[in-house]
Amino acid sequence: MAFRTICVLVGVFICSICVKGSSQPQARVYLTFDELRETKTSEYFSLSHHPLDYRILLMDEDQDRIYVGSKDHILSLNINNISQEALSVFWPASTIKVEECKMAGKDPTHGCGNFVRVIQTFNRTHLYVCGSGAFSPVCTYLNRGRRSEDQVFMIDSKCESGKGRCSFNPNVNTVSVMINEELFSGMYIDFMGTDAAIFRSLTKRNAVRTDQHNSKWLSEPMFVDAHVIPDGTDPNDAKVYFFFKEKLTDNNRSTKQIHSMIARICPNDTGGLRSLVNKWTTFLKARLVCSVTDEDGPETHFDELEDVFLLETDNPRTTLVYGIFTTSSSVFKGSAVCVYHLSDIQTVFNGPFAHKEGPNHQLISYQGRIPYPRPGTCPGGAFTPNMRTTKEFPDDVVTFIRNHPLMYNSIYPIHKRPLIVRIGTDYKYTKIAVDRVNAADGRYHVLFLGTDRGTVQKVVVLPTNNSVSGELILEELEVFKNHAPITTMKISSKKQQLYVSSNEGVSQVSLHRCHIYGTACADCCLARDPYCAWDGHSCSRFYPTGKRRSRRQDVRHGNPLTQCRGFNLKAYRNAAEIVQYGVKNNTTFLECAPKSPQASIKWLLQKDKDRRKEVKLNERIIATSQGLLIRSVQGSDQGLYHCIATENSFKQTIAKINFKVLDSEMVAVVTDKWSPWTWASSVRALPFHPKDIMGAFSHSEMQMINQYCKDTRQQHQQGDESQKMRGDYGKLKALINSRKSRNRRNQLPES
């Protein structure tokens, strides 16, 4: 029965390997939630065992706090350790609003609560906070104190309407930025969720929004993110960029397609004087493309923008915009990461405008006269120093913006292809954060990619010779135990920490765990982690300012042969030899699991003192990711097996297994229905002398039986030791008699 169970498990194991086998790259290190906690490089926070839809909405590195919104709660967590010194404010929706929400047919659990979706810094002492308010948005001011040591965290003002500042539906994303105590938001402004707007509120000036119900401006948008980005040296030329995806009808107006878009407005826009009153007069948008071009020409688009990260530099024009995209097709599923130069984005907004012409409303480049100042220009900036406000714009400029908000050219990524593509995986990317790391052999971008399965992949971008960047998955970490999709992610390069949220809670993870790679120079070098280097004693954090020349690191090639000379490389050529026994005609498994799934495995077999030869794989001998499966063991399988792993042209012996084959009849007689741990105590009850047993087997056979029984005994230490030995004495006696006669005929003189 046990053997049958083993066979079934082995079959399932093989099938799982076949199913999971894919050309998609795998993480070099995978840590489960519990394994990650054991490394002492992560922390976890949750208010309760019930899901509360946590969102990390603001990170303040000056006050060492991160601010989290959840259902009915506002949280202030310690940026150094989120599980310590947590502050919270209970801020539920009013009972009346909750009852009205339920009567309107909304979800009592996931809709009829106050889901906090906006937390922005208002001034040195207060935050501005908004929540969905059970489909009746509310906002308030929250006192956080002047210093983090004050331990102040409370609402000290009355609530006000959040309409135009936060979406009614908590499942519809709200994005926002705060500039000079003015709130710029992208959200849906009504209960039914039909009026989308980019809105400026909380202002001493007039409130301004996008043109209402104008599909040229916004067409069922789903907002993703918003950022303030400088444009030149004049601060008046800065723009607020909104990233979103929207549903657009094709030329036949029959089907809707999802396109990812970037829109921008000037923060000092006060609307038009006669047209577009209290509407944006600087609103422009452009399509954001992330696609793979097939060999025969057509493009495969990753249409749906999921998240955006801006990797800033000293020069704003060299800022990189990272975006995560997924496919909208039900047949073709995948994720991609595309990277854009901010200068390319600004070039598109300074380029030709789109214009629909002809009966099919075909988009063409606008060929008419462009009014002055150029539509989309900010008042009071470098190009319009004499215009203090948009109300001074000529009417033709305002009219042009209303009818031509779309740019003709699309925005393409660097090299016009994605940096990372994942197809046919059981996950999709949801969030992204990027860190710039200085290593011994150059500067690298390290991507942290959150998935819908509660994991974070740590990916390093590697330069190649043909202007195409490669990528290597260094780690995949289970940051949430129940595989909850990641909803928000913030990174602190200053603290070297990553903060991740899900429906269940918030996790904090260090950007590096150098000690997990191994205790040898080669292990550290093969990891190719730009955060880590071999310091002569261990794999530890690499600091580019260090003066020690013994630091060994090779991110680009990961070659221990050039980096680890003098650090006991010969130890990798040999592994400790172990003895393993198999029973003839049964199935056995020779275990060999390399540290890295990116390593290739080769099995070599050495019989007696012959040369090692590569094991020939077939239906009986199967190589798996965990070792070598030998079905129906034969005598010819006996020998010394070498498991050789090759990674980056570096070879090392992972395992040496001296495999010995036992006769099935002999093992059956000795072990069938016999408890191995009571053999010695029960041998006196046998109807023959113990010397008869010793003489029935050769010396080598007895050694193998002893070792086999020892191994079996260790596997059954937890069994029932009170069970007495039982067996077929007649069968054993017959075997002993036959072995006696055979041994007398083949007896060799003792040396």
From Swiss-Prot:
SUPFAM superfamilies per the UniProt record, alphabetical: Immunoglobulin (SSF48726), Plexin repeat (SSF103575), Sema domain (SSF101912)
Annotated signal peptide: 1-20
Protein source organism: Homo sapiens
Lineage: Eukaryota, Metazoa, Chordata, Craniata, Vertebrata
Protein's name in the database: Semaphorin-3C
Location(s), subcellular: Secreted
Keyword Disulfide bond: yes
Gene3D superfamilies: Immunoglobulins, ligand-binding face of the semaphorins, domain 2, YVTN repeat-like/Quinoprotein amine dehydrogenase
Pfam families: I-set, Sema
Gene Ontology biological process terms, A to Z: axon guidance; blood vessel remodeling; cardiac endothelial to mesenchymal transition; cardiac right ventricle morphogenesis; dichotomous subdivision of terminal units involved in salivary gland branching; immune response; limb bud formation; negative chemotaxis
Known role: Binds to plexin family members and plays an important role in the regulation of developmental processes. Required for normal cardiovascular development during embryogenesis. Functions as attractant for growing axons, and thereby plays an important role in axon growth and axon guidance.
